[in-house]
Design a protein with these regions (language model features):
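Active-site proximal beta-strand in glycosyltransferases
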Residues: 2-4, 103-121, 149-151, 173
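N-terminal strand-loop element at the rim of the active site
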Residues: 6-67, 160, 172-174
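A short, histidine- and acid-enriched strand-loop-helix "catalytic/donor-clamping" loop
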Residues: 8-14, 59-63, 108-129, 140-142, ...
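Membrane-proximal helix-turn-helix segments that form the acceptor-binding/catalytic region
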Residues: 22-27, 73-76, 129-151
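An amphipathic, basic-hydrophobic alpha-helix
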Residues: 57-86, 96, 100, 104, ...
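Short His-centered aromatic/hydrophobic patch
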Residues: 89-95, 114
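A short, active-site helix/loop in glycosyltransferases that binds the activated sugar's phosphate group
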Residues: 144-172, 180-182
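Conserved donor-binding/catalytic core segment of Leloir-type glycosyltransferases
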Residues: 177-179, 189-204
Length: 204
């Protein structure tokens, strides 16, 4: 069985999805990672874990149609070459372009992760409004297929996608986050006395 995990940036994969890839590898999958070309140290880390890396020219903020078409062609070529059984797309562009490429190739199980809708859906102004409408249209055209399964991390996003007729409700599930490796982050005893709490997060 072959699995491809597709993300914008390799550092994001290493910080958020590496344990999933290792679990799939240990379960017997041949695991491939596709992302924007990164540092040699990050690629070496994948090699040590016996994960195969494939550079894809993702540009997170690009709106250049030729560049975006090039990215789509690269994904389509990669899927034809590897013939994966499952593709797992994470973040907006991998979800949209990866799903489209996988549907063109044929019988591939498609699992998309929508961890949040991001800043675009709360930003004000006419530019943000237009971009949001275009993104929702793209989601509806590309994701509205019985071949596609979607993971959400909160019910509000699932409801929004359902209201805009983007998804098949029976092809979705809600998970409570990307997960924490408890072998690496071990539970510590609660200190006595008055504690201090630090939140390290991006507030939207």
């Amino acid at each position: 069985m072959k699995l491809i995990i597709v993300v914008n940036e390799l550092w994001f994969f290493l910080s958020h999805r590496l344990p999933i890839a290792l679990a799939a590898r240990d379960a017997g999958y041949e695991v491939h990672i596709a992302a924007h070309l990164s540092t040699s140290a990050e690629i070496e880390q994948l090699n040590r874990e016996h994960l195969q890396f494939h550079p894809i020219s993702f540009h997170r903020s690009s709106l250049n149609p030729w560049q975006e078409f090039k990215t789509l062609k690269e994904l389509n070529k990669l899927y034809k070459q590897i013939q994966p059984d499952i593709v797992h797309h994470v973040t907006i562009k991998p979800v949209l372009y990866g799903t489209l490429a996988a549907r063109w190739v044929g019988d591939i199980k498609i699992l998309n992760a929508i961890s949040g809708l991001g800043y675009l859906f709360i930003a004000q102004g006419w530019k943000s409004f237009i971009r949001k409408k275009i993104l929702l249209w793209g989601y509806r055209v590309i994701l509205n297929s019985k071949k596609v399964w979607i993971l959400f991390q909160n019910p509000d996003d699932q409801i929004l996608f359902s209201q805009h007729k983007i998804i098949y409700p029976k092809h979705t599930a809600i998970i409570k986050g990307s997960g924490v490796d408890l072998n690496q982050f071990i539970t510590s005893p609660i200190p006595k006395g008055k504690g201090k709490i630090i939140l390290v997060a991006r507030m939207l």
